[in-house]
Every structure is written in C-alpha cells, then in structure tokens.
A protein has these predicted regions:
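Bacterial N-terminal signal peptides that target proteins for export
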Residues: 1-10
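Extended, compositionally biased intrinsically disordered regions at domain boundaries
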Residues: 5, 20-24
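Bacterial N-terminal signal peptides
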Residues: 9-18
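Ser/Thr-rich, low-complexity intrinsically disordered terminal regions
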Residues: 23-143
Length: 143
C-alpha cells in the first residue's frame, strides 16, 4: 500500500513538472507589415497600432513617434501577470517585439537548452500574434 502511494506521488510530481515545462515557449517575432509588399504611411501605421491595441485590450504605456509601448492585460489580472511589447514603426512597416513580462514564467538565460533564447508563458506568443494579425488586417483595409 505504501509503495502504491509513493508511486502515485512520484507520478503526480513528474506530470506536474512536465506540464509546467509545456507552459513556457520561446518568444516568437511578428513579421512586419512592410514585408508583405504593401506600404502605409507612418501616421496610418500609428493609428492602426492604437486601433488594434484597443480592440485586443492592450494598454498604451508610452506613445512616441516611431515607437509605442503596450501592456497586456490591463484589467484586474494585471495584478498577477503582465506582458510588455514594443511596436516600432517607420518607412511603411512595423515590428512587434517582446520586451518583458511579470508573472509569466520568463526565462532570459535560455530555455530548451538554447542560450540567448527568451522563454515565456505560451499565451504571450498568442497575444502578440493576435495583435499582429489585427494590425495587418487594419492596414490591409486601408487600400
């Protein structure tokens, strides 16, 4: 009986460890709009960034010419976790880059055995990808 309980506890601990590892993923980069071949003015890209941020409920922390700093989420969940991204734009294109996070399992010194790779909770990549999709859709509607 003791052996069964010990085996069950060991299995549960192993599965919890594996599930925890599956939560982290390397940060992905969003392909910029300018690489699609279409061009938009900097003013139009800036407006699209603000629209997409509002649609996805990202908060604007800093808004300077050529660079907008966004955080997600902006509701009560932000007390527990938050991701920060930078959207740089100019010359008809933009780029969404991960900056930092809090409470999202960030590992800056490498993950999955790869040095220099930043890993965060897998949802961060989805949030960034959705923001990028909305930006591309908004900018594509301009033409």
């Amino acid at each position: 009986m003791k052996r069964r309980a010990l085996m069950a506890a060991a299995t549960a601990a192993f599965l919890m460890g594996v599930c925890g590892m599956l939560q982290a993923a390397p940060v992905a980069e969003v392909i910029s709009y300018g690489q699609s071949g279409l061009k938009a003015s900097d003013a139009r890209i800036h407006e699209a960034i603000k629209q997409a941020a509002q649609m996805r409920k990202w908060g604007i922390v800093s808004d300077k010419p050529g660079k907008v700093l966004l955080v997600y989420p902006t509701n009560n969940r932000s007390l527990h976790y938050q991701a920060t991204v930078s959207v740089t734009y100019g010359k008809g294109s933009y780029k969404v880059e991960y900056v930092k996070s809090r409470g999202l399992d960030e590992k800056r010194n490498g993950c999955y055995g790869k040095e220099g790779v930043v890993c965060v909770h897998r949802n961060v990549n989805r949030w960034i990808a959705n923001l990028g999709k909305d930006l591309n859709r908004i900018l594509s509607q301009s033409y």
